[in-house]
Amino acid sequence: FNTWVGYEVISPAANFNYSVSYLFSNGPFSHLGVKADFALSDDVSLMLAVTNPWDTNDISGSGEYALGGQLGAYGQYLNLYYDSGTNGGLGFEIDYTGGFDVNEDLFLGVNAAYNNNPETDSGFYGAAIYPQLSTSDDFAIGLRGEYFAFTQDGFDDVPVFGLTLTGSLTKENLIIKPEIRLDSFLNDNEPFLDSDGVATNSLSSFLIAAIYSF
């Protein structure tokens, strides 16, 4: 089953932005195991899970397992994941996912996470906001603003700031999404290449995605 951790999901039809966040890319994607959901009240829920280590969708060759949980209340969710961090494991991650209806046309989504792997002395942390404005029944525009940083003991953090502006036009089962994305790494990190093949700290991109659901 798909992960309970994070604001964004694997299916592009369910995400507002077409490209995915750093928070999504560095968390778990899917799990093989069992989970139990409990409705504590009309507005409060609890989920507990025992799975193979993250993204191990077959037999756990290491013989290890992972634990997970989710507490939901009034549309806000606190998510937990833990494995030992060995054999390529993720370690410990705590994640908050939620959102608020500012008015009938404006929604504000929020995601924040912290990860630590004691085996590799590494991890990450970050936060993202997702304001989304519906301008008509067929069209909406949304922004993702994200701050994310990789961590490694003994080294400076590697932070990145990202902005993604997405339009979403829906016609029956078809969604058209034009999108502009800007990524900028800080602390003199230059992971990208410009048009001349020279290392640079920033990247701008544009795409138009067509998503058909059936």
Feature map (PLM): residue ranges:
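Surface-exposed coil loops of outer-membrane beta-barrel proteins
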Residues: 1-72, 78-82
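Outer-membrane beta-barrel pore domains
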Residues: 73-80, 86-214
